[in-house]
């Protein structure tokens, strides 16, 4: 992406049709300079349902979407374990990528993704909505008024009663750290604007 698209809408492809897509589309539908061109999923049936629900013009396979020259960027809303593979395929095809959080299930995956983005000179971003949340920007504006930040305490949680959910399955990259802990880590880094010197962790 760049100067070549400054005078037209950014054309998006949905590379997946996961549950989070419904919430993402509520925001996307309010943005004037983006156009959802097509949707792809593991099954054509799932993609077709999404296309009908959100009036998306085309239903494609993953391969068809990545070969399309009229798609500038793809959004990847699939389970955590599939993020890296799809993101790298998209970037190798010359597409910019917005991938749901966590972008990778470990730092090694993220490093591979960023290396791929640099090699192919495309945009790569992890979709963390709190990064642009108005309240966060307001907090940042007042940090200088309170002096040096010495302690940051965060809590981000929700109730989950489905013990069979992938969120509870470590073999499917489940667990609180990858699902919601990323918000606490992003917030802390935004506030401190520094890399950690060392990390102490615990679990039970």
Tell where the protein language model's regions lie, with residue ranges.
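Beta-loop-alpha module in the N-terminal Rossmann-like domain of NAD(P)-dependent dehydrogenases
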Residues: 54-116
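Rossmann-fold dehydrogenase core element
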Residues: 111-129, 148-154
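Short active-site oxyanion
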Residues: 11, 34-38, 72-74, 124, ...
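Predominantly a Rossmann-like dinucleotide-binding segment in NAD(P)-dependent oxidoreductases
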Residues: 130-201
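Short catalytic-loop micro-motif centered on adjacent basic/acidic residues
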Residues: 97-100, 124-127, 200
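N-terminal Rossmann-like dinucleotide-binding module
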Residues: 2-54
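Alpha-helical elements of Rossmann-like donor-binding domains used by nucleotide-donor carbohydrate transfer enzymes
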Residues: 23, 49, 64, 73, ...
């Amino acid at each position: 992406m760049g100067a070549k698209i400054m005078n037209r809408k950014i054309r998006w492809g949905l590379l997946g049709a996961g549950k989070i897509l419904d919430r993402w589309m509520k925001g996307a539908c309010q943005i004037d300079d983006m156009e959802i061109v097509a949707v792809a999923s593991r099954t054509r049936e799932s993609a077709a349902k999404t296309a009908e629900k959100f009036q998306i013009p085309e239903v494609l396979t993953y391969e068809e979407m990545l070969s399309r020259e009229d798609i500038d960027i793809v959004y990847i809303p699939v389970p955590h374990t599939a993020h890296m593979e799809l993101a790298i395929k998209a970037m190798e095809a010359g597409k910019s990528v917005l991938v749901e959080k966590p972008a990778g299930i470990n730092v090694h995956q993220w490093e591979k993704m960023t290396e791929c983005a640099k090699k192919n000179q495309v945009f790569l971003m992890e979709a963390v909505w709190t990064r642009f949340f108005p309240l966060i920007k307001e907090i940042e504006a007042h940090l200088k008024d309170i002096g040096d930040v010495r302690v940051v305490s965060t809590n981000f949680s929700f109730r989950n009663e489905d013990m069979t959910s992938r969120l509870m399955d470590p073999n499917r990259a489940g667990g609180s750290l990858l699902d919601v802990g990323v918000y606490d880590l992003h917030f802390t880094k935004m506030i401190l604007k520094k890399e950690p010197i060392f990390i102490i962790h615990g679990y039970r």
